[in-house]
């Protein structure tokens, strides 16, 4: 739809009471109407919202009477004037051409909408009006036509970009592309075989030449066994009957295939062995799974007061060495009454970072009641990471089995990620 202002489609011009004192246009001059208001200062001087915005940006006063106006919210809304404006009659904007001459709308007397409605009815009318200009629904990029909505059927009958079915193969094709489709793509159009001169559909022709045409020259099927003959397909049976050495050619082919199968089997078996070995290596260099059993737990609980730890044996993941530190009576006074447990990376301080995902699982005689916590951490030096309050000491007796405490340890070193940049 062409751009327009409401004062361009009025049946009768408005008197000055409805106009802005600065731009002289109606204060309500565009849709949607609910976004516009008739606003005046306390002395009744009326401006449109756009002009009020510009005026208050320059000076906080009415440009006519100079009364102070700090913001739009201080202005008065003239609802009586708005109601009168909404009752004014206008022509439907779809009653005009979709272009202007000398910045003026041109009435379309033959094909345009003839409706005359109130300004208040305008928006609802436009939602249903069949005279609105639309773009081609087939291909608005290639088809530049614009037409009224009620003329869609007429346009579709002549549009070169409508999709139609090929009369031969029934495939959907854009009308403008139909000659190219018939020339190059249609599978039903009959084409002549260059060898036997019979006619076939394009799709059938390819199969005919590859597998059926009697005049196509082909290799002997025993070429792989040593037969170098090339004959027309129609003479193939005769060739195979007359040549008594084809059994020897077949034996050569069979033997060659047997050797290839044996070699393939050997390679597959080796790949399976190599794969299993690589799986083991990857597991060793990136992950450790095991358990740490602490015997005589009750004695340990007595002999290791708060802030003193038990230290597990070292275990390695690739070149990294780790150990677990366990505080039976808690790490420092804050965590007294709890068992604390930490994973330590044992290496000299380094600028590189080792990212580790790990878990500790305290085993219960009933596996469904085992206690497990997991965590991730970035290590740059020999500092522990873990759980200061892993379990309340009062509850730990439920996990003692034959005087032993067993902890499952699962530690995985996450490979570092890197960004590659080319300048």
Swiss-Prot record:
A single GO molecular function term of this UniProt record: zinc ion binding
InterPro entries per the UniProt record, alphabetical: MATH/TRAF_dom, TRAF-like, Znf_RING/FYVE/PHD, Znf_TRAF
GO cellular component: cytoplasm
RING-type Zn finger ranges: 20-66
Subcellular location: Cytoplasm
Major localisation: cytoplasm
Zinc finger extent (TRAF-type): 124-179, 180-237
Keywords assigned by UniProt, alphabetized: Cytoplasm, Metal-binding, Repeat, Zinc, Zinc-finger
Comment, domains: The MATH/TRAF domain binds to receptor cytoplasmic domains.
Family assignment from sequence similarity: Belongs to the TNF receptor-associated factor family. A subfamily.
Role noted for this protein: Probable adapter protein and signal transducer that links members of the tumor necrosis factor receptor family to different signaling pathways by association with the receptor cytoplasmic domain and kinases.
Entry protein name: TNF receptor-associated factor family protein DDB_G0277243
């Amino acid at each position: 739809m062409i751009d327009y202002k409401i004062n361009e489609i009025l049946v009768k011009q408005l008197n000055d009471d409805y106009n802005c004192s600065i731009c002289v246009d109606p204060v309500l001059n565009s849709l949607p109407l609910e976004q516009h208001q008739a606003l005046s200062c306390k002395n009744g001087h009326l401006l449109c919202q756009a002009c009020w915005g510009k005026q208050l940006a320059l000076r906080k006063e009415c440009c006519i009477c100079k009364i102070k106006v700090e913001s739009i919210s201080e202005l008065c809304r003239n609802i009586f004037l708005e109601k009168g404006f909404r009752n004014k009659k206008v022509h439907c904007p779809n009653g005009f051409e979709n272009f202007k001459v000398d910045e003026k709308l041109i009435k379309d007397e033959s094909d345009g909408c003839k409706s005359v409605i109130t300004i208040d009815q305008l928006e609802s009318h436009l939602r249903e009006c069949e005279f609105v200009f639309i773009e081609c629904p087939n291909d608005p990029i290639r088809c530049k036509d614009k037409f009224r909505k009620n003329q869609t059927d007429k346009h579709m009958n002549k549009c070169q970009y409508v999709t139609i079915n090929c009369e031969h193969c029934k495939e959907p094709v854009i009308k403008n592309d139909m000659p190219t489709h018939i020339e190059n793509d249609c599978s039903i159009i009959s084409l002549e075989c260059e060898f036997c001169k019979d006619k076939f559909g394009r799709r059938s022709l390819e199969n005919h030449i590859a597998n059926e045409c009697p005049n196509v020259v082909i290799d002997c099927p025993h070429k792989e066994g040593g037969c170098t003959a090339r004959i027309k397909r129609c003479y193939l049976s005769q060739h195979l009957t007359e040549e008594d050495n084809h059994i020897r050619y077949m034996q050569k082919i069979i033997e060659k295939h047997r050797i290839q199968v044996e070699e393939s089997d050997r390679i597959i078996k080796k790949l399976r062995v190599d794969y299993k070995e690589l799986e083991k290596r990857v597991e060793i260099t990136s992950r450790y799974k095991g358990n740490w059993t602490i015997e005589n737990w009750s004695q340990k609980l007595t002999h290791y007061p708060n802030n003193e730890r038990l230290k597990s044996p070292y275990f390695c993941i690739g070149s990294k060495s780790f150990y677990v530190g366990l505080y039976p009576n808690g790490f420092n006074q804050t965590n007294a009454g709890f068992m604390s447990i930490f994973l330590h990376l044992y290496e000299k301080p380094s600028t590189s970072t080792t990212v580790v995902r790990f878990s500790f699982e305290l085993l219960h005689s009933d596996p469904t009641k085992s206690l497990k916590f997991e965590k991730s951490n970035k290590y740059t030096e020999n500092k522990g990471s873990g759980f200061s309050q892993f379990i309340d000491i009062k509850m730990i007796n439920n996990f003692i089995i034959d005087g032993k405490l067993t902890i499952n340890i699962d530690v995985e070193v996450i490979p570092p990620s890197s960004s590659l940049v080319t300048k």
